[in-house]
Amino acid sequence: MTNAILEINGLHQYFEKGTPNENHALKGIDLQLREGEFVAIIGGNGAGKSTLLNSVAGSLPVSYGQVKIAGKDVTYQSVEKRAKLISRVFQDPRQGSAPLLTVEENLSLALKRGSWRNFWSSGVKKNERDVFKQKLASLGLGLENRLSAEIGLLSGGQRQAITLLMATMRQPELLLLDEHTAALDPQTSATVMQITDKIVREEHLTAMMITHNMQDALKYGNRLIMMDHGQIAIDLNAEQKQGLTVPDLLAMFKEKSGTALTDDAVLLSD
């Protein structure tokens, strides 16, 4: 039986608890991601998807419940402690790399897990450079010829593709993708999604992707979760979501939740 990489048990998240503005953002979430699962999580604004991802990442303290990664209880661990198990790609392409360092320096730093001491003491070795060239060439963007370019001079799509490589260089137990194509134009977004899918499949990674794009949620990954008001409304495996269209998904959501999805950010993303 395939191991559970992520286990969430009875997870509740409150904001401003005990005040007139109390928001019960997550309501007893139970969720497991098994090794090799690539789950896309969608839902309207306020559904709880970003709160869920931030709770897993450690950037939001858990109100109640438990989070385990690769069998380790990380419920009360900091973001820094969890970084040994998790890699995260943010929405902003500028957030995952050091703009004044070159492409190869950023990749080298990622390989050394952000250890500046190891980075400055050894620099970029020839064998590392050869690996970087090979990995960059596999992206099909010509970036293998830009190793010495400052990463801050690259386009958002190029930078996000490199950030994906950096995030997966050391085979994280869990890859978190936080609307990582939302800031890109449609054509670049499609390219980065294809690269994402390729990396996740070839590296046999376990990944959780937050997205507003229903087409991407249907096209990519082997599992789809739709959230509503802090709960999981729909949970489909690869076979169940195969052949579904956006209208099918919207109809399913209405049947499960009793209401139609009205968030334009989701409805217009296809």
Language-model-derived ranges and their functions:
Residues 42-44:
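The feature captures the beta-strand-to-loop junction immediately N-terminal to the Walker
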Residues 242-270:
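ABC ATPase nucleotide-binding domains
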Residues 211-212:
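H-loop/switch region of ABC-family ATPase nucleotide-binding domains
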Residues 2-5, 14-28, 78:
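A short, flexible loop at the N-terminus of ABC-type nucleotide-binding domains that lies
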Residues 57:
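Helix-to-loop junction immediately C-terminal to a conserved catalytic motif
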Residues 65-73, 236:
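Conserved ABC transporter NBD signature motif
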Residues 19, 23, 73-87, 95, ...:
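ABC ATPase NBD coupling module
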Residues 167-168:
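ABC ATPase C-loop
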